[in-house]
Structures are given as structure tokens and as C-alpha cells.
Swiss-Prot record:
Disulfide linkage: none
UniProt: Mg(2+) binding residues: E158
Gene: fni
The protein's name in its UniProt record: Isopentenyl-diphosphate delta-isomerase
Organism: Limosilactobacillus reuteri (strain DSM 20016) (Lactobacillus reuteri)
Assembly information from the UniProt record: Homooctamer. Dimer of tetramers.
Binding positions for substrate per the UniProt entry: R9, K10, Q157
Function per UniProt: Involved in the biosynthesis of isoprenoids. Catalyzes the 1,3-allylic rearrangement of the homoallylic substrate isopentenyl (IPP) to its allylic isomer, dimethylallyl diphosphate (DMAPP).
The entry's keywords: Cytoplasm, Flavoprotein, FMN, Isomerase, Isoprene biosynthesis, Magnesium, Metal-binding, NADP
Cofactor(s) the protein requires to work: FMN; NADPH; Mg(2+)
EC number(s) stated in the UniProt entry for this protein: 5.3.3.2
Binding site for FMN: A68, M69, T70, S98, N127, K188, S213, T218, A286, G287
Family the entry assigns: Belongs to the IPP isomerase type 2 family.
Subcellular location(s) of the protein: Cytoplasm
Length: 348
């Protein structure tokens, strides 16, 4: 059976993400963050607890998780099955790709349903556009028995996408969904980062979980520009804030109950730790894990996930931190570019 136009678009996203992987990872922005070593951590690895409480009713067993990637096609089904199996094995939370497609192509749901089938007791974040209706949100959460809902905000991607949305009046709808849903709502960028202004707007609309998702990983500007054969948006290929810049933006404002999640350009356990030092409560990883799965195979990603869990725990012990949530007390210095950004933005 021929796949729908929406499914074909999902396959294009996967193909182009792989095509541009090496290009977008030429710059490793977390290199601009150096942690200060303390020779006396006074800690054992047994003292370290990797659990993280993101909300009253949302706890994850490990501070990094498998971030939203794909869904809606046969190829996506295969990927999601493997990712869900590994999430189950390693007790990792996992976010789905955007479920918005299922309202237009109901047959595509099987590529998402497989995630819960392979990981019946795990933590799963459903994912929808920020303009989703309450019925769509309730349906997505119910179908997957999701523990949380990610609402992605992706204005830059949509504007470059030839068939993308052009209406970005999202805040009131986000606030409404937060107030009506029984599961925590995470508002997430898609690789363009967030400013303190954006974060403050979300706070005033009752959002308490924010994924700043900065530039440095999967580049949807490049992906959608490649798909757009009418208008060239090449000037926007480096649009937005990097993940470290976005974390500094978040750190500069009074957060209250708001918890920050980081994603975008995370390629090592040390990046996970650095994100925590800069204020992230948890860290999502998508492109790096997908690249291993597609190019090296299931067993290689299985080994990588296990190694990351061991290394993150040992790095916490090295820094004298009994949990991920106390990393913000670790001292650090910034490289020239990131320090200049922080000073010009009055972030430190």
C-alpha cells in the first residue's frame, strides 16, 4: 500500500536528518562550557541516585531520555519499535514524534502505538503541535497511556516548510491545555532554542516544564529548506540560540516552579552533565541516538545507552553530586564566544 503524503514527509525528515547529521555537528557548542574539577568530591558512586522528579506526578529513572524523533510511516514504526525496546531495557523515558499526523492519517497510529506495546510500563511523552485541540490532546494521551504531553513550538520550521502553518497564536491554547489535562505538559522547541522572553511568556501562561531545545543538533531549517523548491531560506540555517545559550537565558530569570529541560546537540554523557550544571533538570537526546541506530545498529545503541548511564553516574560522583538536580552548584567557566553572548544579553 502506498503511504500517505504525510507519511512520505516523515520519511523525508528521517532521510534529510541523516544527510545533514555530520554538517550540523561540526560545531559542538558545549565545548564552550568547562567544569571546574574538585579533587576531593567526598562521594562514592553508591551515593548517587539518578532519579529525577520533573513534576509531582512525573518521575524519570535517569536524567537523560530518548527525545521525540519520528512516527507516521512504516520506516518510523521500525525505528520506534527498536527505540521503545531499548527504552524498556534501560528504564529510560521516551518521547514520541508528533502525533498530529494521526488526525489526517489514522492508519499511521500503529507507528506510535508500538512504543507503548514494547514498553508497557515505561514513561512515555506524547507529542503534539501547540495548536492541538483539547480532544486531540486527550486522544493522544489516552491512546498511548502517556505520562506527559509535549507541545512543540516550531515557528521557524513551519515558515520554511512549504506546506507549514502560518498562524502562531499559541499561548492561550497552551495555557488552556495545561489547565485541562491531567498529565504534565512540556512545551518544547525543535532546535531553535529559547530566550528569557519566551520562557517568561510561558511562565505567565502557567507552563512549568519547558524544553529549550537549542540549536546544535537536528536542523529543521536545513531539512525544510531542502524540501522547499520554491523559496530559498538558506539565510536561516543558523537561526536561533544554541542549547548552552538557551540554558543561560533560562538561568537568568526567576523560575519559581518552572523546571527546564535541555535538548539539541547532546552527544556525550559530559554534555548531559554540563546541561545539568547550566540548570537543566533533565536532558533529551534524539539525533545522536538515531544516528547510531541507523548507521551502527541496534546493538551499538544498546551498548551506548548502558555506557551513558554508567558514565553519568560516575561523573556525578566525580563532581561530588549525589543527584542530577544538585549539579547547579558546580563551578564552571565559559569560552570566549559564550561568555560574550552572556554579557551582551546581561545573563551573568
Amino acid at each position: 500500500m502506498m503511504e500517505s503524503r504525510h507519511a512520505q514527509r516523515k520519511n523525508e525528515h528521517l532521510s534529510l536528518a541523516a544527510k545533514y547529521y555530520d554538517q550540523v555537528h561540526q560545531h559542538h557548542y558545549f565545548d564552550q562550557v568547562r567544569l571546574i574539577h574538585d579533587s576531593l568530591p567526598e562521594m562514592t558512586t553508591d551515593d548517587v541516585d539518578l532519579h529525577v522528579q520533573l513534576a509531582d506526578n512525573l518521575e524519570i529513572e535517569c536524567p537523560f531520555y530518548i527525545e521525540a524523533m519520528t512516527g507516521g510511516s512504516d520506516q518510523a514504526l521500525k525505528i520506534n519499535r527498536q527505540l521503545a525496546q531499548l527504552a524498556h531495557k534501560h528504564h529510560l523515558a521516551m518521547a514520541t514524534g508528533s502525533l498530529s499526523i494521526i488526525s489526517k492519517d489514522p492508519q499511521s497510529f500503529s507507528s506510535f502505538e508500538i512504543i507503548r506495546e514494547e514498553n508497557p510500563d515505561g514513561i512515555i511523552f506524547a507529542n503534539l503541535s501547540a495548536n492541538a485541540s483539547l480532544d486531540q490532546a486527550i486522544n493522544a494521551i489516552s491512546l498511548l497511556k502517556a505520562n506527559a504531553l509535549e507541545l512543540h513550538i516550531n515557528a521557524a520550521q513551519e515558515l520554511i516548510m512549504p506546506e507549514g502553518d502560518r498562524d502562531f497564536n499559541w499561548l492561550d491554547n497552551i495555557q488552556y491545555l495545561v489547565s485541562e489535562l491531567e498529565v504534565p505538559v512540556i512545551v518544547k522547541e525543535v532546535g531553535f532554542g529559547m530566550s528569557k522572553t519566551t520562557i517568561a511568556k510561558l511562565q505567565t501562561h502557567d507552563v512549568h516544564l519547558i524544553n529549550v531545545s537549542g540549536r546544535g543538533g537536528t536542523n529543521f531549517a536545513a531539512i525544510e529548506n531542502r524540501r522547499n523548491h520554491d523559496i530559498n531560506f538558506e539565510s536561516l540555517l543558523d537561526w536561533g540560540q544554541t542549547t548552552p545559550e538557551s540554558l543561560l537565558e533560562a538561568h537568568s530569570i526567576r523560575r519559581g516552579k518552572t523546571e527546564i529541560i535541555a535538548s539539541g546537540g547532546i552527544t556525550s554523557p559530559l554534555d548531559v552533565i554540563k546541561a545539568g550544571v547550566l540548570g537543566a533538570r533533565a536532558v533529551g537526546v534524539a539525533g545522536y541516538f538515531l544516528n547510531i541506530l541507523q548507521n551502527e545498529g541496534y546493538e551499538a545503541l544498546d551498548q551506548t545507552l548502558g555506557e551513558w548511564q554508567v558514565i553519568v553516574k560516575r561523573l556525578l560522583a566525580l563532581l561530588g553530586c549525589s543527584s542530577f538536580t544538585v549539579l547547579s552548584r558546580v563551578e564552571y567557566v565559559l569560552g570566549t564566544d559564550l561568555l560574550s553572548y552572556a554579557r551582551q544579553r546581561h545573563l551573568r
